[in-house]
Amino acid sequence: MVKKSMAFIMSLLIVLCTTPFVNANTGTEFDDSKSDVSCEWIQDDELLVKDGTDLSRIKIDENMVTVTNLKTETEEYFYISEGKVHSSITGETVNVLERDSSEITNSDSTIKKAYKSKTRTTKITYAKIKKLAGGSAGLATIAASIVALLGAAGFLCPGATPQVLSLISGIAGFASTVMKGSSKHGIKTTLKSYKRNVKGDIMECWKVTKIVKY
């Protein structure tokens, strides 16, 4: 069931990223003057992120989140497969299902009856994020790794990258805290589900509403 769910979720990512929902997000997503972080959609599936003097492009494909540093012209990726995320940055793989199987959603089927929105919370340790993002990552790479981990956990979150960036940029010293790599502390992410029409099927998707440290 888990393998079926993961395959279904990954196969929908491109479809979801090229529907009017994301097209409507074209333009500035947020501009946080306090943290000097801003981002905007430059194509249906590509996001431009400015973090201080760093400029990055995040691209979401069917089962991959790619981060390109436009200053150094280096490209890295997070590959999602069967509840796992592999990082080209570190060469490491994080198994989301190893301890978080209770967080797997049931998004492997369309919604056939009256729908009631749900709220879920999931925890991600700093150790997992650092294992994927590396020891000197900026907010763009950290956000991309979080989005990949949520996808591997079964949360279908179209357009989640700006939400994640906005929330983590508001946490003082977040990147430095992540780089410490604690396995006992991390982030608690709250997601709220909603229904969405995808080519005639009503699907359950998720919006990231809150990220706090624990």
Show the residue positions of the predicted features.
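Sec-dependent N-terminal signal peptides of Gram-positive bacterial secreted proteins and lipoproteins
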Residues: 2-25
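Alpha-helical hydrophobic membrane-insertion segments
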Residues: 5, 22, 133-136, 168-171, ...
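Residues within alpha-helical transmembrane segments of multi-pass membrane proteins, especially transporters
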Residues: 13, 153-156
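N-terminal propeptides/leader regions of secreted preproproteins
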Residues: 21-128
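Hydrophobic alpha-helical transmembrane segments
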Residues: 158-168
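Active-site-proximal helix/loop microenvironment
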Residues: 159, 175-178
